[in-house]
A protein has these predicted regions:
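Conserved short histidine dyad/triad with adjacent acidic residue
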Residues: 65-82
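Short acidic-glycine-tyrosine-enriched beta hairpin
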Residues: 102-125
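Glycine- and acidic-residue-biased ligand/ion/polar-headgroup-sensing regions
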Residues: 83-103
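Short, charged/polar surface micro-motifs in flexible loops or helix N-caps
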Residues: 60-62, 72-74, 94-96
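A short hydrophobic beta-strand segment most commonly corresponding to one strand
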Residues: 87, 122, 137-155
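Short beta-strand His + acidic residue motifs that chelate non-heme Fe in jelly-roll/DSBH
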Residues: 77-79, 97-99, 123, 129-136
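A short, N-terminal "cap"/entry segment at the start of jelly-roll beta-barrel domains
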Residues: 2-63, 78, 112, 157-187
């Protein structure tokens, strides 16, 4: 029996890749592509390897976007939130998810959850979160699916920064090449 996440991932791979050569292309025929041949970058973030497997700009996706992200030991995402749902499938490694609600003036002390190979978790719309690779000996690799691409990220300096003070990063690093447009906070 296939998991829904595997079906979503495989469907995205089969139906979303395009025949166009441009990284920012959104038209073309569906293709099957090797993940190892897709563009990979860390976008100036030490310890990160990001591949857009199926993206709004790279592949014309409108409802979901799929990433393959690898974090080296000790690396992490920023404390952030976004106006989309997010699903993670941990492919290898282990780490910690920190998450706090956006229902108060600021996130506050986050809840902590252990994440590990073959686990999955989701982030509700606008919940403030951060993922750390807390394993000293192994990379943390995750398949990430977001709704409503392209992602609009609000970054926090710490867990006690008011939501209204969070800094918008849009377009996000992997979308900068393809999109330049101002966007307002949706909270």
């Amino acid at each position: 029996m296939c998991s829904p996440f595997l079906i979503l991932f495989l469907s995205s791979l089969i139906f979303s890749a395009t025949a166009e050569a441009s990284h920012c292309s959104s038209t073309g025929l569906p293709l099957v592509r090797k993940i190892s041949e897709l563009p990979q970058d860390n976008y100036g973030r030490a310890g990160l390897s990001h591949i857009t497997v199926a993206g709004s700009f790279s592949h014309g996706m409108r409802e979901v976007e799929v990433w393959l992200q690898t974090f080296s030991p000790g690396s992490h995402t920023p404390i952030h939130r976004h106006s989309c749902e997010e699903v993670f499938v941990v492919l290898k490694g282990s780490g910690t998810l920190y998450i706090a609600s956006s229902s108060h003036e600021y996130p506050g002390k986050p809840q902590e959850f252990s994440i590990f190979s073959n686990s999955t978790f989701h982030i509700p719309v606008n919940d403030v979160h951060q993922v750390w690779n807390t394993n000293e000996h192994e990379d943390l690799q995750m398949l990430v699916i977001i709704s409503r691409p392209p992602v609009k990220v609000f970054i926090y300096k710490d867990w006690f920064m008011p939501h209204t003070a969070a800094k918008l990063k849009f377009p996000y690093y992997w979308d900068e090449e393809c999109l330049q447009a101002p966007i307002k906070d949706e909270l």
